[in-house]
A protein has these predicted regions:
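Extracytoplasmic/secreted envelope proteins and their assembly/folding machinery
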Residues: 33-37, 56, 60, 88, ...
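Conserved helix-turn-beta segment immediately C-terminal to the redox Cys motif
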Residues: 37-57
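Soluble non-cytosolic domains of exported or imported proteins
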Residues: 27-34, 50-54, 82-85
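Positively charged n-region of N-terminal signal peptides that target proteins for export
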Residues: 1-4
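Local sequence-structure signature of Cys/Sec-based thiol-disulfide redox active-site neighborhoods
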Residues: 18-43
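Thiol/selenol-based redox catalytic cores and closely related redox-interacting motifs
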Residues: 61-126
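N-terminal signal peptide c-region/cleavage motif recognized by signal peptidases
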Residues: 13-16
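Short active-site oxyanion
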Residues: 21-22, 46-47, 78-81
Length: 126
């Protein structure tokens, strides 16, 4: 089943980041985040700066993201926030379209088959 990426309204300003920077804040105890970052690096052809962040609730609050959409990492790409294992194709669509009012996408939890959460018997959701 295809994971649905949910639009989230973010209150914090991420526009100050350079267009080429990809910054991923992650739970330092999580192992899947680095796999997700590796896929992002490969598919975007850009470096990913990984920031270990044990108190992720602070960034979620700053971005105005509801706790119900929280996952193990938050990436900021071209001023748009991506929470959790958002499929890379969906990220590229949002970054290309930059729809008015959409400041980010989220996939809550850690769904099997999503980037970084591949598992035998579950289709890859890219």
């Amino acid at each position: 089943m295809r994971t649905i990426a949910l639009s989230i309204a973010l209150l914090g300003s991420t526009a100050a980041m350079a267009a080429n920077d990809i910054v991923m804040h992650r739970d330092p105890g999580c192992g899947c985040c680095e796999k997700w970052a590796a896929q992002v690096r490969q598919k975007f052809g850009r470096a990913v700066k990984i920031v270990d962040d044990a108190n992720r609730a602070v960034i979620h609050k700053r971005l105005g993201m509801p706790a119900s959409l929280a996952s193990c990492h938050t990436a900021i790409i071209d001023g748009i926030a991506f929470e959790g294992h958002v499929p890379i194709a969906d990220m590229k669509r949002v970054l290309a379209a930059k729809p008015k009012g959409v400041r980010g996408l989220a996939v809550a939890g850690m769904p099997l088959g999503s980037p970084g959460m591949e598992a035998p018997g579950y289709p890859a959701d890219h």
